[in-house]
Amino acid sequence: MDGEDIPDFSSLKEETAYWKELSLKYKQSFQEARDELVEFQEGSRELEAELEAQLVQAEQRNRDLQADNQRLKYEVEALKEKLEHQYAQSYKQVSVLEDDLSQTRAIKEQLHKYVRELEQANDDLERAKRATIVSLEDFEQRLNQAIERNAFLESELDEKESLLVSVQRLKDEARDLRQELAVRERQQEVTRKSAPSSPTLDCEKMDSAVQASLSLPATPVGKGTENSFPSPKAIPNGFGTSPLTPSARISALNIVGDLLRKVGALESKLAACRNFAKDQASRKSYVPGSVNCGVMNSNGPECPRSGRATFFHKGAVNGFDPAPPPPGLGSSRPSSAPGMLPLSV
């Protein structure tokens, strides 16, 4: 009570609740202390009874021990007599054993000398063994290093061979792409020059040029994309087996992407030219009065242009306005024209 600080109360109800709670707390503490006192009294009575029983047992044990002590005193007297008799006999035996001990010590000294000689020989053998083990470990380490170096060189040789194969394949594919690109550029120039006069005839010439370009020696068409583009780690720089730097790899990928976009644009132009030729032929057969078409030679029909009869945008035919180029390598490109093999890039 004296050590506790009485808080300030704002109302009589709070003060009443505080003192009531405090009284209940002290009442509970009093009840617990009284219970502990009762338990302590019961335990002390039980302990007193137990101690009295132990005292009775200790007194009985003391009487038994006194009887045993008296009996043991008689036994000690008898053992003293036996000990004196044994001492006389043991003295005789000790004299005999001393003679034997002197002889045994002489033999022991001889054996100690022999053991020292054996230990020296053993030390020499252990030193030789340690030297042999060290030399064997050194030889084994050098042998393992040589094996690892040979394995590393073999892996480098295998990697170099695979890189040489990849370089040759990439060179072949680059040559094929350059040939196809040159053929399509010539094809585009011829089509652009002759489109206003005879688009159908130009398309047929373009088909023949593409077929001629396909007859050139190139890499097989059936190669998949997974064989055409090796991983960045496998692309050599053409002067050694060291991999490309990140900037060179990015520039190479940009060049390949530009080539793919150009090829897609050329294919879209070819498809537009073919569609234009087919539409002109269908319009000639179904709308004979709108366009005056006649057969000029055996290469194909020649249709004069008419401003009111065409259904195509002028720029899409003469300018070969291509479709938007693909955003990446994985995007879809317009399908090739009929009769043409798809490019393996």
From Swiss-Prot:
Q: Which GO terms describe its molecular function?
A: alpha-tubulin binding; beta-tubulin binding; identical protein binding; microtubule binding; oligopeptidase activity; protein-containing complex binding
Q: Which residues form a coiled coil?
A: 28-190
Enumerate the Gene Ontology biological process terms.
Answer: cell migration; central nervous system neuron axonogenesis; centrosome localization; cerebral cortex radially oriented cell migration; chromosome segregation; establishment of chromosome localization; establishment of mitotic spindle orientation; inner cell mass cell proliferation
Positions of region (Interaction with YWHAE): 189-256
Give me the ranges of the annotated region Interaction with KATNA1. 195-256
Required for interaction with PAFAH1B1: region residues: 114-133
- Where is the PTM Phosphothreonine found along the chain? T219, T245
Q: Which InterPro entries match?
A: NUDE (IPR033494), NUDE_dom (IPR006964)
Q: Residues annotated as region Interaction with NEFL? A: 191-345
Post-translational note = Phosphorylated in mitosis. Can be phosphorylated by CDK1, CDK5 and MAPK1. Phosphorylation by CDK5 promotes interaction with KATNA1 and YWHAE.
Has keyword Transcription?
A: no
Task: Identify the stretch(es) annotated as Disordered.
Answer: 217-240, 314-345
Q: Give the region (Interaction with DISC1) as residue ranges.
A: 227-278
Q: Where is this region: Interaction with KATNB1?
A: 64-189
- Name the record gives this protein: Nuclear distribution protein nudE-like 1
Question: Which gene codes for it?
Answer: Ndel1
